[in-house]
Amino acid sequence: MPRTHKIEDYRNFGIMAHIDAGKTTTTERILFYTGKSHKIGEVHDGAATMDWMEQEQERGITITSAATTAFWNGKRLNIIDTPGHVDFTIEVERSLRVLDGAVTVLDGNAGVEPQTETVWRQADKYKVPRIVFVNKMDKLGADFDKSVESIRDRLGAKAVPIQLPIGAESALRGIIDLVRMKAVVWDTDALGAKFQDEEIPADLKEKAEAARNYMIENAVELDDEAMEAYLSGEEPSEEVIKKCIRKAVLTGAFYPILCGSAFKNKGVQPLLDAVVDYLPSPVDIPPTKGIDFRTEEEVERRASDDEPLSVLAFKIMDDPFVGSLTFCRIYSGKLETGMGLMNSTRDKRERVGRMLLMHSNNREDIKEAYAGDIVALAGLKETRTGDTLCDPNKSPVILERMEFPEPVIEIAVEPKSKADQEKLGVALSKLAAEDPSFTVSTDHESGQTILKGMGELHLDIKIDILKRTYKVEANIGAPQVAYRESISKRTEIDYTHKKQTGGTGQFARVKLVFEPGEPGSGFVFESAIVGGAVPKEYVPGVQKGLESAKENGLLAGFPVIDFKATLVDGAFHDVDSSVLAFEIASRAAFKELREKGGPKLLEPIMAVEVVTPEEYLGSVIGDLNGRRGQIQGQDMRGNATVINAFVPLANMFGYVNNLRGMSQGRAQFTMLFSHYETVPQVVAEEVIKKYA
């Protein structure tokens, strides 16, 4: 079927927030008022439409980003639900990559919270235009002005209210629309579906005038004509104000602030109007960049049906009815079912079996999709998160890849029976395909299966999925830290491998210079061979030997990182040399670093932020110091104190329960991986003794 909406009428947006700011409730209300949900799902009773994995319904947090299509005022909305829990920032990054705009939801009582900052910074990285919805204005202690202030202070963003609340806490009646200078008041009986315009209450008139002037002054700055008219005393029309606010959102000049209470059904329709009026369509954002598959030159793809097809797979989910679903954003061109595609990231062929339009948990089969659409494809075999799909015959392209953070925490899993062993293998490969920040490996020595993730909650949920969805019974080890190793000295190692016992022998000599690298540089290999001391075809053998040797460590079997190896000299034999011989030689040379390279143990250091009421400050800081934490600074946020610290991950296990106990459940914390650092000698000796 032909296109039903012009691409200019699309709004691909996500809703981002701190955990518990009311993001899922806001999404639910949007689906309810746009007519896509027949009953309102409440997170409190575990019934929200978007949160459709059992684990999410129980924990009341959103884990997977489900994509949903809805309609409002003749525009087509594709809503991507993003998780707000810090263990799932990978999901947030992934959904930000495919969004054109976002609504940031704040809790009117708390303002900007730690995870708000995290997702805001990620949105800055991808230059996502945003509007802000201050939610929960019906809550005790909700304070709109303070929330707006927190956006300025904590995010350093220019916040310009375009609405004000009427009443607060339980007396919240509606909002003042500063663009139209009208009060919008909701009828409490009709589940928020009925509302009407009224005159602005007398006691708020002055405040509204001042807020409107501030809004207009900031808006007209973006348009010379409007600015001139305003300076000569002419009041801008509603149309001009909207045009200027839209420009501000697209350029990031300022962020419009709206307010309401999704739970009490107030303020959601004006929020939808703002999404339509101010957030970008696919043609308002810069063309997406990519690399030509054949020439490797940079190319651009405009959001148009006439351009060659380019599609980004941003999420893979296992669906109980359809099997594996790959959520995709079509950046350009037209996609049809039955089409043969090329996965240009992996140079593999794919065929589109079924194409579905998702409404959080119902699905609609479609035959065609166009630039700007977000669809789920069934039946793809080779595609992983972050891969590009395109037309093999029309200038295939690789869109920019997404970068995923290192998993820093691991647990061992042992299946309880032979039958579980088989189920475990299948389940884990599916989970790893769905989530690039979750990796599965086998410990060569113990034969155990090792799962690595971003945090305790991340791994808990994976284990939960194994047990519930895949019915795997397994014994779970205690969480372990993903230590790493490195070297501290520059050293030259000359190693000759020869094995000549009649018949074809083996011979290879390598001279390698090893030196410590910058933190985060990983492993760098370079060949500085001149004059053919080691023929070109054997150099990959040297690199391969080092690649495999570094995985087994020097001290305690942890991968070696942040070093450079340069092949400077060597020797070969016409008959006895081979790629394998050079691989064995470089592997043996690497092992000598144990004695000569000053090996050291590294541990992951987490950036921890604790928000605690003043009275527990002493105990919290004392406790962090006891965990080898380095306090980086503290701030006031309302009447709470915010402590920032670097703490080794090894000392953060079970911290959530400790902190609760210490603060009677009133303090919270978030942590993100920051960097690797050398482990103090005393601690290192214990770790090496345990693992070596």
From Swiss-Prot:
**Keyword annotations for this protein?**
Cytoplasm, Elongation factor, GTP-binding, Nucleotide-binding, Protein biosynthesis
Extract the GO molecular function terms from the UniProt entry.
GTP binding; GTPase activity; translation elongation factor activity
Q: Which residues form a coiled coil?
A: none
* UniProt similarity note: Belongs to the TRAFAC class translation factor GTPase superfamily. Classic translation factor GTPase family. EF-G/EF-2 subfamily.
Q: Which GO terms describe its cellular component?
A: cytoplasm
Subcellular location as annotated: Cytoplasm
The processes (GO biological process) annotated in the record are:
ribosome disassembly
**Which InterPro entries does the entry mention?**
EF-G-like_DII, EFG_II, EFG_III, EFG_III/V, EFG_IV, EFG_V, EFG_V-like, G_TR_CS
* All residue ranges annotated as the tr-type G domain in the record: 8-283
Task: Give the protein's recorded name.
Answer: Elongation factor G
Reading the lineage from the top rank, the first entry is Bacteria
Q: Which SUPFAM superfamilies match?
A: EF-G C-terminal domain-like, P-loop containing nucleoside triphosphate hydrolases, Ribosomal protein S5 domain 2-like, Translation proteins
Q: Function, please?
A: Catalyzes the GTP-dependent ribosomal translocation step during translation elongation. During this step, the ribosome changes from the pre-translocational (PRE) to the post-translocational (POST) state as the newly formed A-site-bound peptidyl-tRNA and P-site-bound deacylated tRNA move to the P and E sites, respectively. Catalyzes the coordinated movement of the two tRNA molecules, the mRNA and conformational changes in the ribosome.
| Positions contributing to GTP binding | 17-24, 81-85, 135-138
- Please provide an example of a Pfam family that matches this protein in its UniProt record: EFG_IV
